[in-house]
């Protein structure tokens, strides 16, 4: 499988996440001096609440983004987790991360023999309930409050709709006819899914490779068509060199055991 990644987008999002968390923290700390002045200057009460609310929102947003764009052995970044799970696919599959299409960045898309699959990922841990294109978190209000700085659910169906629309517009402008579909993939196996009649396939990360292999094309894509899609969709601010993931296991070479020689010169 070939991989194209806009590492420049990753670096920029990391910087934005750190700055958001930093300035959010400063706003939160800035409320304390105003609190001590409340008694002498009551008009500062409103300013204190504005700083507190703004700092809380900005700090939690920054922490969410830091978690999203960090990469550790226990918590791989979304694009790297997809790479690891789909690495056994042959070279006719091309995984593009953070493709800049017009004004929108499509985080993950897979060019496969039958077309293009938009992969919308979520690292959400709790219980996710979906009815067609409507998503909500199930849980107590206090649990939601403490989870504000962690991975969020949002509406992955809407995000997939927007990504598909951007890709279809780019294909139309380039006069390319390719089927585009979407899949919603949850990265954390601890998530609880309650899904009924979703607009797109919803699955855990472990099931993604099997789903991709099941997408049998009516007319397989030619190499020229595939490269035209790569030229159109594989754009970004700082692209990594295209990588090819190995699809075969290395062949183990058996070593010969050295022969032992007896005292009369004959091999044992």
Locate predicted features:
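Surface-exposed interaction regions that form or flank ligand-binding interfaces
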Residues: 1-104, 111-112, 116, 125-130, ...
